[in-house]
Amino acid sequence: MSIDLKLSRFNRIYRPSEALEGKIIIKTQSSISHYGIRLTLKGSVNMQVRGGSAGVVESLYGVIKPIPILNRTIEVKPSGKIASGTTEIPFSVTLRQQGENLEKFYETFHGANISIQYLVNVDVTRGYLHKSLSTTMEFIVESDKADLLQRPIPPEMVIFYITQDTQRHSLLPELKSGVLFFYLRIGGFRVMGKISSQCSLAGPISGELTVETSAVPIHSIDIQLFRVESILLGEKIATETSLIQTTQATDGDVCHNLTIPIYVILPRLLTCPTTFAGPFSIEFKVAIVISFQSELSQLHKKTDSGTPKLWLAMETLPLELVRTK
């Protein structure tokens, strides 16, 4: 005996003004009696503050009361019997009904401290002497088309320069003073380019970079995507920045004065439109990280390359993500 949910869309993406449609599939070897089949839709913003992202006072809050977005239960079938074999029961529920005073439908997002999740649950109640049947499935919510920008936005580009003088952390001596080459000391490095500062969630982060000069050979250049989650706690704000994704742009030393394209696909469930709500906010950053060849770096292969280190040079820029039609 089993129960399963099958939604009408394989990608499980729905908009608040649309109906969530699908089938409840029940398989049983013999007919069973039940006291009703109920479908429950739930959506909420779940927040927590971990010890590493807040001080002692903030960490006392722990898990914060969720912000409810959607909570609705409907009876799909009254009490009765389910015949043996496979039974399919269709359902259709509009997510946002007219006249309802609901919280804003934020887009689905799974972060470190903030999670925006929508679930559909079905229960087949069978009384005290029999085990009830139940199953839950997550569906994804995206903004209504009426709330989106009318046309795709061209990606806004920002120009960046990465040199030894733009770094706020300590660097290896050879990166600053250079190396000795035929009795001449060649020093420093300079990388310039441009990258998206605003882009659509349906498109990539794009841009280009050029290594103009580098006294020390380059090991790799990575494009890193970060999320910045902020939660309001009383009069304070707890903020945590965490790495979402790393995309390698180059591997090995790079030819100088050669234009290298930047093209990064955004992960669906780990990103959402840049959001500024009252109790929380979700922002994003993009970093260009240059790793230079160094014996010291070989001893720290397992460390997070997003953290400033002696053999790394980086530039971090804000990134606004938007949903377009």
Residues covered by each model-derived region:
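C-terminal beta-sandwich interaction modules and adjacent acidic
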Residues: 1-325
